Amino acid sequence: VRLRVTGVVNRRQLLAALVTVGLWPEGARSATTAQPTVQRRWASGNTTLAPLGWLNEQLLFNGDRTLGRIDPQLDSPVWTVPHGLSSPAVYRPRAAGQSVISGGQRELGAWQFDTGQARWLQKAQIQIGTPFVTPERSYVGDGHTLMALDNATGAVAWRFASTPDTLAAYAPTVAGDTVFFGPGNGLLYALNAPDGRLKWQLDDSKEWQYIRQMFVTGQVLVAGTYTELLYGIDVDTGKILWKFKAGNFINSHHVAGDTAYLWSPTGWIYAINIHNGSVRWRHQTTRYGNRAANWAPMMAELVTFERKLYCLDMAQVLHVLDAGNGEELQRIAFAHDLRPTVSPLTSTTAAVASNTGEVQLVQW
């Protein structure tokens, strides 16, 4: 096969070309390759989209200007409204019950899920963080304080103050009647969800400052730090059950069932047993001495769907792995720039967000 190259070809275009002509680097040949086609395009009214949300078979989007809901079966959004925030919406919209929750660093707001009608807007006293949303309440940081907001009215049910001059930028999480909160002071708090009363606190500040993400499965809180450590913590007592050292910072992790998945910049995808922190499997993404086979770094969150793990790298290649054993099943190379978000809808379709502000339904 002879390839004629003119002008400047970037890595993404080269990967797409290799897929087209049936070529692929050594080390990736066990995975099938595919090129996606765009089946539907939805204009969002945004220049820059945040990651997409998903609830009840509906896509949710927000960005620098608007908030909206999409039925993937329809050619036009169900509704799109100007969000009216004084700064861009920076995280994916959350939804639970009848509310869609969206915000930026200066405000947090709620909109009606069915119609997009605005319900309330809560202005920051210091800086709004990322919320965790339940059907009745939204839990969100404002500066060093955690607030519990009523989803119907925006009324503050309670506040819990941590150490001044810290920023609770990352989302808390909720399991049963407990809210878990790590505001960036090296502490993890367990609070009583109805009234904000402190149940226990864990101080491991010698190892972490921020807790970036938290998931609860059964009796285990899986907490990622903005360092190289992933924790398993007993939800009732705060006892550390295990620590996993990834070898470099953990951008994000994902929990499905009794397995936590993460990408480490050391060049591995790990699947971790959440009960004891042992490695179920690992998949190499950086092959030293064979740069052509390397994955690009990842900003997008890992996603599981129908026992597959979806990993979108920064070269716009979607890697599909068997979630049970880590075998790479498929590589899907996009020829256009994407935002770091992917929402699998079926085994051959997904929703993605383009760098031009479109939400796209793609098929491969």
Residue ranges and their predicted role:
Residues 339-364:
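Blade-level signature of beta-propeller repeat domains, shared across WD40, Kelch, NHL, RCC1
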Residues 59-60, 100-101, 138-139, 179-180, ...:
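Conserved beta-propeller blade signature
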Residues 34-54, 79-94, 118-133, 159-175, ...:
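Extracytoplasmic beta-rich repeat domains
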Residues 62-64, 103-105, 141-143, 183-184, ...:
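Structural signature of WD-repeat beta-propellers
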